[in-house]
Amino acid sequence: GLFTLIKGAAKLIGKTVAKEAGKTGLELMACKITNQC
């Protein structure tokens, strides 16, 4: 029912946020390594 829908949406949002955060983190590390921050 509704609970399953909310749980599914939360999981999807969590995945998206994690992916974006991971991408940002990698970019930050790359610019620190190359000293281009």
UniProtKB/Swiss-Prot annotation:
KW Acetylation (keyword) present = no
Where mainly located?
secreted
Q: Which organism is it from?
A: Odorrana jingdongensis (Jingdong frog)
> Keyword Disulfide bond on this protein?
yes
Task: Tell me which UniProt keywords the record has, alphabetically.
Answer: Amphibian defense peptide, Antibiotic, Antimicrobial, Disulfide bond, Secreted
Coiled-coil regions listed: none
Question: What GO cellular component term, any one, is given?
Answer: extracellular region
* Domain of life from the UniProt record: Eukaryota
| One Pfam family recorded for the sequence | Antimicrobial_2
Return the protein name: Esculentin-2JDa
Give the UniProt tissue specificity note: Expressed by the skin glands.
